[in-house]
A protein has these predicted regions:
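S-adenosyl-L-methionine
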Residues: 129-166
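C-terminal catalytic and target-recognition region of SAM-dependent MTase-like enzymes
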Residues: 191, 205-270
Length: 270
């Protein structure tokens, strides 16, 4: 390898090894481009012994195969743990659409919670392939299916066909990673929420979130409200949540509060 492991993780591994923790190996993913902005080197590779980087985990009673080496970030988004659990009460018997499903986490939680049918959508072939594997791993392949499509293209097609869902979930990637692109991000969030609301049955539910700290809570809330007015929907807020507590919010750092997660009941204006 051309670059050494990050000093922090390398030192932790060394100390744990010296203390008899018997950690045989670590796969480090300090490869985010943002490290360069901070003058930090990027590193991706093993510390200690090598091992199979396709691992199985369990969260909320749902099992997943996780690709630590080549998956997005570290292969799984742990910050949504309790938000995934929050949808369980809505899902029994429901027809569910999960947009930007990644490796199927929200879709699989919906299936485990008793949804009648779940369709997960993602533009990544690798993500959809893993999501299908995860459905089989949990015995959900008969009720939870996945398609590899661009969500912005698929939702208007579903609307044109007259499709309706009891519950639509939006978990998109960050539409903005800088202040300079907030304006375009607002358009993206407004459009995707507008399209999703059109697919929700009268009295059905929408879960929607943003993982960009540049899209603050006030602006995100305003954008969702604009989308609802544009399609003549009234929103009843069921829940507002943020990231899991192992991703703590630091009051001295606004950027640490980055994840916003809403559940709404969507009602047609009469």
């Amino acid at each position: 390898r051309d670059v050494a492991p990050s000093r922090g993780l390398g030192d932790v591994y060394k100390r744990q090894d010296e203390n008899g923790m018997n950690i045989r190996g670590v796969y480090e993913r300090s490869d985010a481009k943002v490290r360069l902005n901070e003058g930090l080197e990027r590193f991706k590779g093993f510390i200690g012994e090598e091992f199979d980087t396709k691992v199985m985990i369990e969260e909320n009673g749902v099992k997943y195969y996780v690709d630590v080496q080549d998956g997005q970030k570290t292969g799984f988004f742990l910050d949504q743990k309790y938000n995934r659990k929050a949808i369980w009460k809505i899902c029994p018997g429901a027809k569910v659409l999960d947009c930007f499903t990644h490796t199927g986490s929200f879709a699989l939680n919906a299936g485990m919670a008793g949804a009648a049918s779940v369709l997960g959508v993602d533009a990544s072939e690798l993500g959809v392939e893993q999501a299908r594997e995860n459905a089989k791993l949990n015995g959900l392949e008969d009720r939870v299916s996945f398609v590899c499509r661009d969500v912005f293209e698929l939702l208007p097609e579903l609307e044109k066909k007259g499709e309706k869902f009891d519950f639509v979930i939006l978990d998109p990637p960050a539409f903005t990673k800088s202040r300079s692109s907030i304006k375009n991000a607002v358009k993206g969030y407004r459009e995707i929420n507008l399209r999703a609301m059109k697919l929700v049955k009268d009295g059905g539910y929408l879960a929607t979130c943003s993982c960009s700290h540049f899209m603050d809570t006030e602006l995100f809330t305003k954008t969702i409200g604009e989308a609802a007015r544009n399609v003549h929907k009234r929103l009843r807020q069921i829940e507002f949540r943020t990231q899991a507590p192992d991703h703590p919010v630091l009051w001295a750092s606004d950027s640490s509060l980055y994840l916003k997660f809403y559940i709404f009941q969507v009602v047609d204006e009469k």
